[in-house]
A protein has these predicted regions:
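Phosphate/nucleotide-binding beta-alpha loop and adjacent structural elements of enzyme active sites
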Residues: 1-125
Length: 125
């Protein structure tokens, strides 16, 4: 089943400020007035068994994964995570995945579509 929650996913439950200019210029800011409710995966889905997480959080992948670390440790879901927003994510994201689930096999995938810069990690047990 697919369930839609009108929330941002973050490392904790919080209120986040975003620019609402649209397109690629939408970004997390600290001084704007456009407030979005955020929640961590562990709180949002604490009574659920998560089996798959697909995430393109526009550069907030690490923070969002940190908010789901208990779900990831407990259920070892398949992960499909964007890897191209920050150069360091190529190294830091798989290290974090292995810290949570050492038996994850992590693959770097480049899909043949535009935009050409999109890289994703696939992690499976």
């Amino acid at each position: 089943d697919i369930i839609i929650f009108e929330r941002a996913i973050w490392k904790e439950t919080a209120e986040l400020s975003f620019s609402d200019s649209g397109g690629r210029q939408s970004t997390l800011l600290t001084g704007q007035r456009h407030i979005v409710q955020a929640v961590d995966i562990d709180t949002l889905l604490e009574d659920e068994r998560v089996t798959y997480i697909k995430m393109d959080a526009e550069g907030a992948e690490m923070e969002a994964l940190k908010g789901g670390k208990e779900q990831i440790k407990r259920n070892k879901p398949k992960l499909f995570i964007a890897a191209y927003h920050h150069d360091a994510d190529i190294f830091l994201l798989p290290l974090f995945m292995w810290q949570l689930v050492p038996e994850y096999k992590v693959y770097l995938r480049k899909h043949p579509y535009v935009p050409a810069w999109e890289l994703n990690f696939l992690a499976v047990v």
